[in-house]
Amino acid sequence: MGKLDKEFYENKKYHFRYYRKSLNHPFLVAVVIESENDDGKVVLSGFNMTRSIEMVLKNPDKFIRINNPNPEDDAPSFVCVDPIKNKPLKLFTRPIRDWELSLEDEIVIDSLLKERL
């Protein structure tokens, strides 16, 4: 864990949002880490799948799951907060049936998220 990461986890209020791959395969797809800044606004603070998965497993009571806001769409949504407008920002969706992921896919997901930010 780098110095900035260490300071973030020690000094900021934070919570986590996560998605699971599917009902049949409960492994995590991705975790978006958010924190409150000095004004109390929630901002996207970082994304690291491997470390985040470890934190989910160690602290399951601190996590909440966000459901897709569109009930007619069967795709999970990766959502974070736009740090400028402080509004939810929908990054991308993909049908659950297409999620066939392994740990090797985390780099691809990470890249997709960064491209959308």
Ranges and model annotations:
Residues 19-28, 74-76:
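Short coil-to-beta-strand transition motifs
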Residues 1-3:
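Basic, Lys/Arg-enriched alpha-helical interface segments
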Residues 5-24:
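Short coil-to-beta transition motif at edge beta-strands of beta-rich domains
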